[in-house]
């Protein structure tokens, strides 16, 4: 009898051990792995195709029923510029042999060739640098990607490519920006030129910095132009670009009426509000124009987590968990990706 009991106990432990082993194998990927995998899934179709000069041939455009008839080629710069502004800091991490490290290395190789093709008139993926005013917006994101991670982007480009970007950015000066957050797009390309020692339009920088300071309302919120609009543009554009432009001005001893420290404090106050919009279930209210920019609504939280630290009362784990849950909810829905990603 005792022998049977002992055998049953041993057998039970064996079953439990097998169960625990299976559980270990079936554990979901970490938050970090999910972020890295999602970044790769979004970036790979754009960068791989563009590195081969095949983005404009293969990218499937979806046009709104209310499309205004503008040149469709603005979509290619929009896809490339905004992608690189988002992932360039990630690509600047030190190389390693992890699965994530291999993803970063591959994306960076594609990105460097894509940067080259974007300004090469002989490339099928030469981007649209003249014409619609929208190109000012998306060129600013390319400039922002250089500012955010120069060692992984700008400094690795050949001299011919760098000179082409300089001329393309200067060529955008003929575009008159709208009297709202677009002043920052105009200023972003000039801030980048200033950062690399090129001649910059200091008047454009002054106007943008001064006007945004005038449009600051209170409690972390800027007005997007003379009139306030309740949307996510404080996170999409205003706080991130304003802070980054001011950082360049400070580094280059270009005097401004507002300090980088103050601008960051304003952004951190905004972060307190924006984090509280995320529900325990990982949802957030959809309001205001451009709501389809999705995770861009929390760019200020991501920027602070990466570069400045979070405001008092917000922990890294709290923000990481909130953003991870939002991403899982958003990108697990069918229709985000097609069979070609």
Model-predicted regions and their roles:
Residues 22-78, 109-113:
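Low-complexity, Ser/Thr/Pro/Gly-enriched N-terminal "stalk/linker" regions
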Residues 271:
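Glycine-rich phosphate/ribose-binding loops and adjacent secondary-structure elements
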Residues 307-341:
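Extended polysaccharide-engagement surfaces of secreted carbohydrate-active enzymes
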Residues 52-56, 96, 178, 280-283, ...:
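Intrinsically disordered or highly flexible coil/loop and linker segments, enriched in small
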Residues 76, 87-90, 104-267, 276-302, ...:
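Aromatic-lined, polymer-binding surfaces characteristic
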Residues 1-24:
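Bacterial Sec-dependent N-terminal signal peptides
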Residues 71-100:
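N-terminal carbohydrate-binding/catalytic regions of secreted carbohydrate-active enzymes
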């Amino acid at each position: 009898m005792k022998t049977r009991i002992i055998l049953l106990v041993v057998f039970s432990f064996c079953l439990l051990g097998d169960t625990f082993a299976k559980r270990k194998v079936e554990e979901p990927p970490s938050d970090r792995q999910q972020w890295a995998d999602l970044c790769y899934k979004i970036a790979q179709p754009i960068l791989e195709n563009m590195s081969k000069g095949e983005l404009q041939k293969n990218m499937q455009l979806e046009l709104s029923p209310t499309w205004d008839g503008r040149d469709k080629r603005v979509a290619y710069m929009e896809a490339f510029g905004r992608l690189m502004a988002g992932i360039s800091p990630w690509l600047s991490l030190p190389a390693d042999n992890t699965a994530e490290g291999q993803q970063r290395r591959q994306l960076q190789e594609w990105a460097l060739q894509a940067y080259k093709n974007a300004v090469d008139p002989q490339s099928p993926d030469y981007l649209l640098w003249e014409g619609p005013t929208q190109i000012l917006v998306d060129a600013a994101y390319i400039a922002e990607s250089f500012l955010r991670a120069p060692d992984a982007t700008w400094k690795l480009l050949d001299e011919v490519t760098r000179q082409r970007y300089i001329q393309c950015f200067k060529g955008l000066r003929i575009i008159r920006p709208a009297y709202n957050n677009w002043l920052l797009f105009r200023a972003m390309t000039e801030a980048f030129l200033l950062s690399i020692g090129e001649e910059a339009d200091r008047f454009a920088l002054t106007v943008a910095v001064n006007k945004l300071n005038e449009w600051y309302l209170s409690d972390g919120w800027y007005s997007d132009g003379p009139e306030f609009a309740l949307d996510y543009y404080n996170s999409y554009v205003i706080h991130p670009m304003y802070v980054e432009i001011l950082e360049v001005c400070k580094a280059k001893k270009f005097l401004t009426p507002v300090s980088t420290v103050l601008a960051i404090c304003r952004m951190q106050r905004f972060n307190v509000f924006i984090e509280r919009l995320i529900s325990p279930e990982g949802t957030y209210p959809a309001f205001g124009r451009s709501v389809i920019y999705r995770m861009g609504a929390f760019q200020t939280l991501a920027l602070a987590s990466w570069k400045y630290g979070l405001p008092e009362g917000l922990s890294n784990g709290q923000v990481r968990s909130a953003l991870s849950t939002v991403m899982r909810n958003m990108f697990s829905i069918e229709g985000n990706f097609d069979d070609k990603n």
